[in-house]
């Protein structure tokens, strides 16, 4: 790409087009802030990642240094119901709207016990409700596993 202001302006307009209705709010400062975000967040009880985590033959997470950014961001295999990590941490993920898996815009949970009481009782939680088109956001309480939904009123 050329290093001219016109090229940068065109690129910013292309990025803004991903956010119809409020794309003009996206500026270079925000793009720079996004670039500084981590590709995943790992805590004692859970991992948050955009698309999922590649697993080895025993269902264990591959080591982070063996995973490409493309796998974390684009790989859709983790959404499959039969892909269950053999780990103690719950994985929060999205990338593929849940309506493409179960024909409804609801959080999909994969419990490891029959009566889950908190986030440690889940293998994985599929959070992507296709908010761009469904205008619905789903949240899950990490302490209880209770689900909450907010639907934007259609105009």
What residues fall within each predicted segment?
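Short, surface-exposed amphipathic charged segments that create phosphate/polyanion-binding patches used
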Residues: 1-6, 141-143
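Acidic, His/Gly-enriched loop-helix segments that form or flank divalent-metal centers
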Residues: 3-126, 130-135, 151
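Short acidic-glycine loop/turn motifs at beta-strand connectors
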Residues: 43-44, 141-146
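Conserved glycine-rich phosphate/nucleotide-binding loop
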Residues: 136, 144, 149-155
